[in-house]
Amino acid sequence: MSEPRQILVTSALPYANGSIHLGHMLEYIQTDMWVRFQKLRGNQCIYVCADDAHGSAIMLRAEKEGITPEQLIANVQAEHSSDFADFLVDFDNFHSTHSDENRELSSLIYSRLREAGHIATRSVTQYFDPEKGMFLADRFIKGTCPKCAAEDQYGDNCEKCGATYAPTELKNPKSAISGATPVLRDSQHFFFKLPDFQAMLQQWTRSGTLQDAVANKLAEWLDSGLQEWDISRDAPYFGFEIPGEPGKYFYVWLDAPIGYMASFKNLCARRPELDFDAFWHEGSKAELYHFIGKDIVNFHALFWPAMLEGAGFRKPTAVNVHGYLTVNGAKMSKSRGTFIKARTYLDHLQPEYLRYYYAAKLGRGVDDLDLNLEDFVQKVNSDLVGKVVNIASRCAGFIHKGNEGVMVGGDAAPELTEAFLAAAPSIAEAYEARDFGRAMREIMALADRANAWIADKAPWSLAKQEGKQDEVQAICAQGINLFRQLVIFLKPVLPVLAADAEAFLNVAPLTWNDHLTRLENHQLNPFKALMSRIEPAKVEAMVAASKEDLLAAEAKAPAGNGELAKDPLSAEIEFDTFAAVDLRVALIVKAEAVAGADKLLQLTLDIGDERRNVFSGIKSAYPDPSKLEGRLTMMVANLKPRKMRFGVSEGMVMAAGPGGEEIYLLSPDSGAKPGQRIK
């Protein structure tokens, strides 16, 4: 038998500036399931996390609420801890980046990087708020977009036209904090020389530490050449002051990942059997895994391993990246009630419903996961109540009535027992690979076989026949043993169901290897309902409560002046209505003005195997139509041809904007090809 593995696991640190929602929970639930699986297998697996508790946003929110930043992060940490615990996320330690351990480790790593020559200093020019007496991050500056002239845009990118730019390019800049006009000032900043680690990162990112899609994306960064990373911020700032540099603070993204180390070090102080160095020092034999979302890959797969390498610590064994959560096929929406906080969910539904649904849909890739609320109800009710729990509820009564709760009768279905045993390695392999969806499919296939076998044997019919009691007992004992196997396989996902099943089965906490054994001549406890069906009305109430959360927030906020306020969303449509529209990528082969028409351009579009003639009212925005030639755009390809005075228009190109000169032709991402369907 192999030695137990030593494994340290982390999830990304939630920011201590707001509530946990179901999108966040996607990460913590999948990490918790993987950790529980490792522990079930007998491995030493430690799961640590912490609140990310530094930064200007926290400082400013605390000021707005009239409390100290320390009070704010303590309040948020209590809320986060409660939400995680009630969702059955079982951290070995949930700490804070605002801790003594994190201060010491951040200073240590910085000093080692500086001594090794990996820190540079130079003056940078930034906007400064003269009223607040502070330098402004890009997101705290608003003004007019230098590209499209849209107002009220952030200091780094325009939400209207998508342009990116330096804050100094923004027209009519204003501080989003005070409303004052910012002034430019110079300040000395500290930079981490990330290019020093280019060769190491090129090798490390291709060494199996990342999913292929993630490694390919990072290759784009690496191929274009890495830039030095600004790791300092000026006072006032809530965080750790850089040693020996009064008024200079570590940027939140420097000390945040060090929070993984700090949380583990804090745990080591309370658990003497744990050795910090054994897990973190260079050459460590322990395994280290980070679970993160795809939005923070660059920090965890470029900056973080480079910092560790430069400071003489070990690098992660792997960084496991996941996609975003959508609800009912769309981005979470406060107006539709699908931006659901963890606590709002818990006020209406059991946590294991969502744990199972996430498990059933999670693969090992970085694709987004959709929480379809109708499918959620159907799948949980069908799989967990209708299949798994149904086996126990079908069989338990006969054993209690016919034999006072004692299981007897031997193995009544050797071929089924063997099938369950044979499936265990594949299920374990799927769990290990984080392919939870595959594991759930294989487990439910076994549940289907067990239910079909019981239905075929029909103990309820045999119980009415004289002389069939022994057969009834053997069938039902077999059913309970199969149920026990399923509980073992599902235990990482459904810990409460497993604990309740263990109480019914009258057994000690089950381990993975218990699937190799059977219960014979064993006394059961009285059966109690293990899980109830989801009531659709409760899901509807949860959505309604989420809308109420929005109304409460809107009551406190000033009226918006964004694009939705100017042009509200249209009424909802059914998916089939949308699916009837055939959207395609199109190459603009030719573009020319239409004689006698003030607004029209005539476009010749290549959509792969054919060309289309399209008239479009975009002339005011594109006075030189020849500049459109060679550009990819998007078109409605199945629009009925329309006869116009100038000819027949065979489709419609897609554009955004209010009209006139403010029309912006839409373009697909690089790599798209003419004729490809837009999905």
Curated annotation (Swiss-Prot):
EC annotation from Swiss-Prot or TrEMBL: 6.1.1.10
The keyword Repeat is assigned to this record: no
Binding-site list for Zn(2+): 145, 148, 158, 161
GO CC aspect terms: cytosol
Cofactor needs: Zn(2+)
Binding site residues for ATP: 334
Motif range ('KMSKS' region): 331-335
Compartments (UniProt record): Cytoplasm
UniProt-listed InterPro entries: aa-tRNA-synth_I_CS, Anticodon_Met, Met-tRNA-synth_bsu_C, Met-tRNA_ligase_1, Met-tRNA_synth, Methionyl/Leucyl_tRNA_Synth, MetRS_core, MetRS_Zn
Annotated cofactor note: Binds 1 zinc ion per subunit.
Reactions the enzyme catalyzes: tRNA(Met) + L-methionine + ATP = L-methionyl-tRNA(Met) + AMP + diphosphate
Any GO BP annotation: methionyl-tRNA aminoacylation
Function summary: Is required not only for elongation of protein synthesis but also for the initiation of all mRNA translation through initiator tRNA(fMet) aminoacylation.
Subunit structure: Homodimer.
NCBIfam families reported in the protein's UniProt record: metG, metG_C_term, PRK00133.1
Name of the protein: Methionine--tRNA ligase
Origin organism lineage: Bacteria, Pseudomonadati, Pseudomonadota, Gammaproteobacteria, Pseudomonadales
Gene that specifies this protein: metG
